Amino acid sequence: MVLPAEIVTAAETADLDAVRAWLDGKPDGGRACINEHDEYGCTLLIACSLSANHPDRRVALARLLLERGADVNRCASDSHNDHLGRISPLHCASSDFFPSRDMLDLLLAAGGNVKAKTSGGAGYIETPLGRQLRTVRSMNYVYGPGGDFPSKVAALLRAGSELDDICVRAVSGASYMSAENLLRQFHQFINSIPGTNPTVIAGANEKCIEAGRMIQGVRAAGSWKAYIRRPHKDVCAVRGLVTKGFLAPPGGGSKYERAIAFVVKQGDNGIVWKVLSYWRADN
């Protein structure tokens, strides 16, 4: 079946009551048709992920749809109209217009595929991380409420996002870009805006650096898990040198260095391992 336009519109406007009433009116609670497309190739889950207004209602609606059997990886259909480019709900939630990562977290927890690529209908072939790093390069982000950008990058990296070949313009001869390429373009964009408040620029640059640090860390470590375990290796290395008398515990320095100093000064290995069991680089 083709989804009724008024129900898709209700999902787009985060009208939770209207969508719930329509689903409840079906013999099976809407489970048989919840993954169908409308005339433009859009599912209900995609529709409720396309905008950022009423974020709490949108997350509640997405949760309802998932409970009723919505496929988190059901992409937009190209059969009727290619303008959505086989976008997934996770691609939508990764865009810069979502001020928080609540929707992103919900879709990731439901099994959203971080490696899925669009088909280029919107002008780009990209993964959710590619879309996040590309769309954040906008005035809406620099001046808007997109302050959760590094946190979203962390969530996507934690879920296993790839770093290479994650975004390319859907034109002949274009080359795929890596996460570092996209972040470099974002940094250049920030610093090319004429007449921008220096405080705004500084804040955006800080977020860019924070995201870059995570991307570089995952690149060097080989995976998110290895990256967040890096402090453990650092502590063990410093502790071994301190124990053998080759190094004095670091004093002062950054918050990270002071944390290492605190841990290596503990004489009881049990205390050290207890601290390390709670310490993660993304906390």
Enumerate the predicted regions with their spans.
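Alpha-helix N-cap/N′ positions at the starts of helices
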Residues: 2-6, 85, 148, 233, ...
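Ankyrin-repeat boundary/"N-cap" motif
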Residues: 2-8, 32-51, 75-95, 117-143, ...
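Alpha-helical recognition domains of nuclear gene-regulatory proteins
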Residues: 21-22, 47, 64, 92, ...
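Cullin-RING E3 adaptor/co-adaptor recruitment helices
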Residues: 154, 168-283
